[in-house]
Amino acid sequence: MKKYQLGEFEEVVILTIAILYKEAYGVAIKKEIETRLARNVSMGAMHTALVRLEDKGYIKSLPGEETEERMGRPRRYYQITALGKKAMEYSKETRNALWSAIPKVSLNLKIVG
């Protein structure tokens, strides 16, 4: 059963929203991911992930103030919901359980062959 489902990029996005806290809007999230992970992110991929996370109820968006630089349109700020926090915790617990289950010998790269 898929209790909470976060794709890899969705997990990166929701973690970044948590990092940015009250400054989590599209371009800021994109830049933070690119800086922290040295990874290029398209605005299309970012938008898709934000829509999916909001559709799942893991985040919510709120309009900010209108700005001239955005031609009067407000930024959309993102916040993690209680359900989103649970999804993040579930994802972390799942990954930690998998890492803990790996036998040390499994990661011994001195394989003779």
What are these model-predicted stretches?
Residues 1-6, 78:
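Basic, short loop/linker segments at the boundary and entry of helix-turn-helix/winged-helix-like folds
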Residues 4-45:
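N-terminal helix-turn-helix DNA-binding core of bacterial DNA-binding proteins
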Residues 14, 77-79:
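Short aromatic/hydrophobic contact patches that present stacked aromatics
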Residues 31, 54-55:
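Alpha-helical residues within the helix-turn-helix
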Residues 46-48, 52-53:
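Basic amphipathic alpha-helical segments that dock to polyanions
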Residues 56-71:
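Beta-hairpin "wing" of winged helix-turn-helix
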Residues 74:
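Exposed loop/turn and edge beta-strand positions of beta-sandwich/beta-sheet ligand-binding modules
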Residues 83-113:
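Amphipathic alpha-helical dimerization/coiled-coil segments
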